[in-house]
């Protein structure tokens, strides 16, 4: 059995300015997105597309839109999905993102709106944009889970002490051995989802239909559905939010939010080959 090392959340303290590890993981996430996206636009189908050529400047603008979507959507998602009653009574607390409280599912909705706006302003197809973005996101999710682990937050459910990697999280207020669910999510939502979407996104079947015409949306559908499946699995090992607990059928809020993602992902993938570009 292991004990969480309780890392110092501050990576660098200059006295007048502090740099937190969690902030560095966000910086790494944005850097990885830029690196992967600029590489992806130089490869098929983007390098050989019939529409306007993609440039590094486009990726920079896309990243800006995405960051705004993540912050606004992530915060509003947490407010609406997890603590609507509290924030309805404390409206001034809604903008206080520095106090914590972000939701992935809300962030995803925010990014979808941001990508739709970007596509409209640039005269591009919506799924052309999201198919570019989708494989570049999981590495950022992986960095976020590393940040959660460093902070010793979002720990897992109680585990059998005989499990070699069972870990005590002192921040939980108990000495129960727990699943290091942050690392499970790092592996599933980060590494596995990245491998799945990146390699599929470079395959011919992802962008060319059976009749040889170009298609968009399959990579996006795989990302949405794949994340839903991986997160649904990981939630069985993650401690439910104390203020919510388990809901109907002993599923967590995270799992219930993943159900429509799985359905939507499957529908997006299935319908992609039936839309004419």
UniProtKB/Swiss-Prot annotation:
UniProt entry keywords in alphabetical sequence: Cell inner membrane, Cell membrane, Membrane, Transferase, Transmembrane, Transmembrane helix
Enzymatic class: transferase
Alphabetized GO MF terms: phosphatidylglycerol-prolipoprotein diacylglyceryl transferase activity
Superkingdom in the source lineage: Bacteria
Covalent S-S links between cysteines: none
Transmembrane segments: 16-36, 62-82, 101-121, 214-234, 243-263
GO aspect biological process, one term: lipoprotein biosynthetic process
GO cellular component: a single term: plasma membrane
InterPro entries xref list: Lgt
Pathway(s) this gene product operates in, as recorded in its UniProt entry: Protein modification; lipoprotein biosynthesis (diacylglyceryl transfer)
Organism for this UniProt entry: Leptothrix cholodnii (strain ATCC 51168 / LMG 8142 / SP-6)
Enzyme Commission no: 2.5.1.145
Subcellular location: Cell inner membrane
Protein name: Phosphatidylglycerol--prolipoprotein diacylglyceryl transferase
Family named by the database record: Belongs to the Lgt family.
Pfam families associated with the record: LGT
Binding site for a 1,2-diacyl-sn-glycero-3-phospho-(1'-sn-glycerol): 145
Role: Catalyzes the transfer of the diacylglyceryl group from phosphatidylglycerol to the sulfhydryl group of the N-terminal cysteine of a prolipoprotein, the first step in the formation of mature lipoproteins.
């Amino acid at each position: 059995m292991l004990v969480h090392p309780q890392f110092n959340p501050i990576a660098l303290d200059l006295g007048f300015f502090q740099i937190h590890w969690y902030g560095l993981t966000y910086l790494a996430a944005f850097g990885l997105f830029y690196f992967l996206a600029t590489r992806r636009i130089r490869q098929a189908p983007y390098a050989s597309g019939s529409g306007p050529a993609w440039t590094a400047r486009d990726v920079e603008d896309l990243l800006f839109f995405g960051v705004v979507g993540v912050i606004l959507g992530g915060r509003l998602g947490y407010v609406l999905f997890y603590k609507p009653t509290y924030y309805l009574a404390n409206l001034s607390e809604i903008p206080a993102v520095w106090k914590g409280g972000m939701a992935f599912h809300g962030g995803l909705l925010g990014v979808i709106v941001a990508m739709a706006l970007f596509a409209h302003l640039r005269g591009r197809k919506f799924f052309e944009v999201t198919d570019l973005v989708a494989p570049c996101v999981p590495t950022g999710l992986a960095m976020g889970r590393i940040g959660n682990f460093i902070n010793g937050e979002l720990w897992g459910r109680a585990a059998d002490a005989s499990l070699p990697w069972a870990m005590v999280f002192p921040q939980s207020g108990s000495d129960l051995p727990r699943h290091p669910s942050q690392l499970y999510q790092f592996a599933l939502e980060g590494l596995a989802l990245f491998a799945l979407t990146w390699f599929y996104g470079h395959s011919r079947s992802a962008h060319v239909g059976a009749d040889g015409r170009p298609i968009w949306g399959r990579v996006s559908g795989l990302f949405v559905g794949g994340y839903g499946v991986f997160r649904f699995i990981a939630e069985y090992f993650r401690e439910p939010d104390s203020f919510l607990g388990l809901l109907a059928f002993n599923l967590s809020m995270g799992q219930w939010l993943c159900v429509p993602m799985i359905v939507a992902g499957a529908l997006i993938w299935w319908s992609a080959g039936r839309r004419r570009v």
